[in-house]
C-alpha cells in the first residue's frame, strides 16, 4: 500500500460541491504542490486556489488534511472540496494522476481502512449498506448495527471458540491428559449458547429482511378484476394500462413505493386463467413465479361479477401458501353479486375511487414487525452465521462422543467463517471480492 490513490468521492452530476479524496504516503506532497502552500494544519479547513503543473488555475477549493493514523484509512488523507459539476473534479483528478497518484479501485479506501485496523470488514459492509439504504427505517436499522453491537457479539463468540479450541488441541497433543468433566460441561454449554445466538441472528435476518430490503407485494387475480387500477392507486400515478379488455397485462410490472417508513416493491401480475395464447401463458407463468417471490399477496376479486371457476383457481392457488394475504373485493361501489363462499375477510374497496382502508391495513401489518434486535442485510454474513451455527452445533455432538479431532475441525470452520468479518481478518483476495461492489472513493 505504498502508492497514493485518488478518486471522486461524491456522486457524478450537477451539484454545489464535489469532493476528491486522496490517500497515501504522498497525499500531503501532492496537496502542497497543487495549492502552492508550504504546510497544512491537520484537521483544519484551508481555503485555497489549486493550480496545475503549468501554473494555470483549476479551481478555488477547501482543502482538509488528515494526518496518519488519524484518518479514515489510517494513512495521510487530503480531501478537496471543489465546485460541483462534471468537469472541475475530473480535471483535478487527472492532475493528481499526472503528479503520481493512482486511480483508486472500487472500495479501496475502505479496504485500506480495514487493513490498517481502522475498522472491521463488518463495519465497512454496514457503511456500504447505509449508503445504499432505500428507506428511513432501513437506514435506522443499519445505523444501529454500526454502533458495534453485532461486531462485538461476533468477536466475543469467535474469541470463545478460539480459547476453547486451544484447550481441546492441547488435549489432543497430550493424549494422556483428558479434559476435566466440569470443563467439558462448560464447553458444551458454550457451544449450545453460541450456536443458538448465531441461529437467532440468521433466522431473524431472513424473516425480517423486508424491513431493510423492502417487502415484495404481488397483486394476483383473474383477468379484468382491477389489478392494474389497484397498482396505479397504490403508486398514485398511472403506471399500468387500464382496459376493459381481459388480458391487457401480459407481463409483470414492478415499481417501488413508500408507505410510511417502509419501502415496498409492488408487482402487478398478468391475470391468471386458462389460455391458448402463448404470450399470455408466459405471463401467467411469470405471475405464479412472482407469488413465490413475494412477501405479501394482494388477492383481488371483482364484486360486480359472479364467482366462477377462474376465481376458484385463485383460491386453490393460494390455499397452501404461508405468505400474508390481503383478500380484496374490488369494484365494491357497483352492485355486489360476488358470493363469499370461502368466508374470507375481504377488504371492500374501489381501486378507482378510494383505497384508504387497504393502505391502513397494510400499514398496520408492516408496523407489526419489530425492528429491534440484531438484523443483518449482507447475504454473505447471514450465510456465515448459518454455517457457523451449524458447525458449532455439530461440534457439541462430537464433544459428547469424545471425537476431539472432529470437534476441532468443526470449531475451526466456525472460527474461520466469523473471522472474515472481524478485526483479525486480513486475507487480501477475500477483501478484494468484498469491496469490489463498493463505490469509487469509498
Curated annotation (Swiss-Prot):
Q: What is this protein called?
A: tRNA modification GTPase MnmE
Positions annotated to bind GTP: 224-229, 243-249, 268-271
**Entries under PROSITE patterns matching the protein:** G_TRME
Q: Which InterPro entries match?
A: G_TrmE, GTP-bd, GTP-bd_TrmE_N, GTPase_MnmE, MnmE_dom2, MnmE_helical, P-loop_NTPase, Small_GTP-bd
Q: Which cofactor does it need?
A: K(+)
Q: How does it assemble?
A: Homodimer. Heterotetramer of two MnmE and two MnmG subunits.
For whether the record's keyword set contains RNA-binding, the answer is: no
- What biological-process GO terms show up in the record? tRNA methylation; tRNA wobble uridine modification
Instruction: Tell me the function of this protein.
Output: Exhibits a very high intrinsic GTPase hydrolysis rate. Involved in the addition of a carboxymethylaminomethyl (cmnm) group at the wobble position (U34) of certain tRNAs, forming tRNA-cmnm(5)s(2)U34.
Question: Where does the record place the TrmE-type G domain?
Answer: 214-367
Q: Which CDD domains has this protein been placed in?
A: trmE (cd04164), TrmE_N (cd14858)
Quote the record's binding site residues for (6S)-5-formyl-5,6,7,8-tetrahydrofolate. Answer: 21, 79, 118, 442
Family statement drawn from the similarity comment of this UniProt entry: Belongs to the TRAFAC class TrmE-Era-EngA-EngB-Septin-like GTPase superfamily. TrmE GTPase family.
A single Gene Ontology molecular function, please? GTP binding
Q: How is the cofactor bound?
A: Binds 1 potassium ion per subunit.
EC identifiers of the protein: 3.6.-.-
Q: Which HAMAP family match?
A: GTPase_MnmE (MF_00379)
Amino acid at each position: 500500500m505504498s502508492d497514493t490513490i485518488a478518486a471522486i468521492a461524491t456522486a457524478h452530476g450537477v451539484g454545489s460541491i464535489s469532493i476528491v479524496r486522496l490517500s497515501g504516503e504522498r497525499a500531503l506532497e501532492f496537496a502542497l504542490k497543487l495549492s502552492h502552500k508550504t504546510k497544512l494544519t491537520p484537521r483544519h479547513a484551508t481555503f485555497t486556489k489549486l493550480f496545475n503543473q503549468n501554473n494555470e488555475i483549476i479551481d478555488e477549493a477547501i482543502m482538509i488534511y488528515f494526518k496518519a493514523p488519524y484518518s479514515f484509512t489510517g494513512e495521510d488523507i487530503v480531501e478537496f472540496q471543489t465546485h460541483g459539476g462534471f468537469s472541475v473534479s475530473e480535471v483535478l483528478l487527472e492532475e493528481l494522476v499526472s503528479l503520481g497518484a493512482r486511480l483508486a479501485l472500487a472500495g479501496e479506501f475502505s479496504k485500506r481502512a480495514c487493513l490498517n485496523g481502522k475498522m472491521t470488514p463488518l463495519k465497512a459492509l454496514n457503511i456500504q449498506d447505509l449508503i445504499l439504504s432505500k428507506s428511513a427505517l432501513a437506514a435506522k436499522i443499519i445505523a444501529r448495527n454500526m454502533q458495534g453491537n453485532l461486531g462485538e457479539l461476533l468477536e466475543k463468540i469467535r474469541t470463545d471458540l478460539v480459547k476453547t479450541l486451544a484447550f481441546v488441541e492441547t488435549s489432543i497433543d497430550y493424549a494422556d491428559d483428558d479434559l476435566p468433566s466440569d470443563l467439558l460441561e462448560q464447553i458444551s454449554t458454550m457451544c449450545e449458547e453460541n450456536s443458538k445466538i448465531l441461529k437467532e441472528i440468521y433466522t431473524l435476518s431472513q424473516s425480517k429482511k423486508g424491513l431493510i430490503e423492502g417487502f415484495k407485494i404481488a397483486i394476483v387475480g383473474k383477468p379484468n378484476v382491477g389489478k392494474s387500477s389497484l397498482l396505479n392507486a397504490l403508486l398514485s400515478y398511472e403506471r399500468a394500462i387500464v382496459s376493459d379488455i381481459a388480458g391487457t397485462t401480459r407481463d409483470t410490472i414492478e415499481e417501488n413505493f413508500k408507505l410510511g417508513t417502509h419501502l415496498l416493491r409492488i408487482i402487478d401480475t398478468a391475470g391468471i386463467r386458462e389460455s391458448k395464447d402463448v404470450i399470455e401463458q408466459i405471463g401467467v407463468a411469470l405471475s405464479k413465479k412472482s407469488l413465490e417471490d413475494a412477501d405479501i399477496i394482494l388477492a383481488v376479486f371483482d364484486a360486480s361479477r359472479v364467482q366462477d371457476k377462474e376465481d376458484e383457481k385463485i383460491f386453490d392457488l393460494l390455499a397452501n401458501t404461508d405468505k400474508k394475504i390481503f383478500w380484496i373485493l374490488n369494484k365494491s361501489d357497483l352492485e355486489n353479486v360476488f358470493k363469499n363462499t370461502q368466508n374470507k375477510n375481504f377488504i371492500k374497496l374501489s381501486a378507482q375511487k378510494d383505497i384508504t382502508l387497504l393502505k391502513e391495513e397494510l400499514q398496520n401489518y408492516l408496523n407489526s414487525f419489530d425492528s429491534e434486535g440484531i438484523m443483518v442485510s449482507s447475504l454473505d454474513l447471514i450465510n456465515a452465521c448459518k454455517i457457523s451455527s451449524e458447525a458449532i452445533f455439530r461440534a457439541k455432538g462430537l464433544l459428547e462422543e469424545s471425537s476431539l479431532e472432529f470437534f476441532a475441525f468443526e470449531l475451526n470452520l466456525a472460527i474461520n467463517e466469523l473471522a472474515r468479518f472481524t478485526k483479525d481478518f486480513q486475507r487480501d483476495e477475500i477483501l478484494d471480492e468484498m469491496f469490489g461492489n463498493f463505490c469509487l472513493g469509498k
